[in-house]
């Protein structure tokens, strides 16, 4: 029992350090806010040469669950989790906001924060996934959520992608480890278009690395679709386009905050796909 408990604890801790994701918040012509994400998980956690798959990704794909979090007789929020993980990296509160987390690759990263938290006792630092759960449990608005996430001191650098219910309510919050400051990228100041934001795992004001450019194909697909055609179906197609879809992709989630609707699909990139 002790061994199982330790495994569950490690699962919840290290889950935050091996994700490679794509998140999109888009506004359709009706003024509704749609939020979509690919969860890519398991980077460097065992490559199977025979099947050309990531071992951890294949295991976790079988454990994807949609959860309805309740307080008393009231549904507070919905999330998509891997069974056993108790934080929130993908979820929405009907009529309030939606939320996804992408890992931010940085030299001053999460393992340093983990050392500070465990060894040095710096308990001011917050776990990324548990902070996501706190946001939903507080039933915050889009603006309140943005403020809380922007000022939080984190164990690991991260991107928080938040959607709301009103025109223009889509933002990418870029956070460094241990800082109360943040960079906010909104639909309004998106240089690609003013009706969506798109985030992978690299700062959107820098060029993506040549070995992992999911951002450029994502923007190309969004422009080909156009705002007038934005829907669950077209966002799913964007996230199913290689290399946005890759060997690490476990699932795609689509959320409409205005309608209180969420759909999740298991994903698998078969054949000659990018490993990440």
Predicted regions mapped to residue ranges:
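C-terminus-biased signal that marks the final domain/tail of proteins
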Residues: 1-20, 130, 134-276
């Amino acid at each position: 029992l002790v061994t199982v408990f330790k495994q569950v604890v490690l699962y919840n801790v290290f889950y935050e350090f091996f994700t490679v994701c794509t998140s999109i918040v888009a506004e359709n012509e009706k003024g509704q806010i749609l939020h979509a994400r690919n969860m890519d998980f398991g980077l460097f956690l065992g490559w199977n040469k025979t099947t050309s798959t990531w071992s951890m990704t294949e295991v976790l794909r079988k454990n994807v669950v949609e959860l309805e979090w309740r307080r008393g007789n009231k549904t507070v929020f919905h999330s998509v989790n891997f069974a056993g993980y108790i934080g929130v990296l993908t979820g929405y509160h009907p009529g309030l906001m939606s939320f996804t987390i992408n890992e931010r690759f940085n030299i001053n990263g999460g393992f340093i924060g983990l050392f500070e938290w465990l060894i040095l006792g710096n308990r001011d630092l917050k776990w990324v996934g548990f902070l996501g759960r706190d946001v939903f449990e507080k039933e915050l608005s889009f603006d309140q959520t943005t403020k809380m996430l922007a000022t939080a001191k984190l164990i690991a650098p991260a991107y928080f992608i938040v959607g709301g219910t009103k025109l223009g309510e889509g933002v990418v919050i870029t956070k460094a480890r241990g800082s109360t400051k943040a960079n906010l990228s909104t639909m309004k100041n998106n240089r690609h278009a003013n009706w969506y934001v798109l985030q992978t795992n690299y700062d959107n004001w820098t060029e993506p690395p040549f070995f992992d450019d999911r951002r450029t194909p994502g923007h190309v697909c969004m422009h080909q679709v156009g705002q007038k055609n934005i829907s669950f179906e077209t966002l799913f197609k964007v996230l199913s386009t290689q290399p946005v879809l890759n060997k690490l992709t476990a699932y795609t989630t689509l959320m409409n905050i205005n309608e209180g609707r969420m759909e999740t699909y298991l994903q698998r990139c078969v054949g000659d796909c990018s490993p990440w």
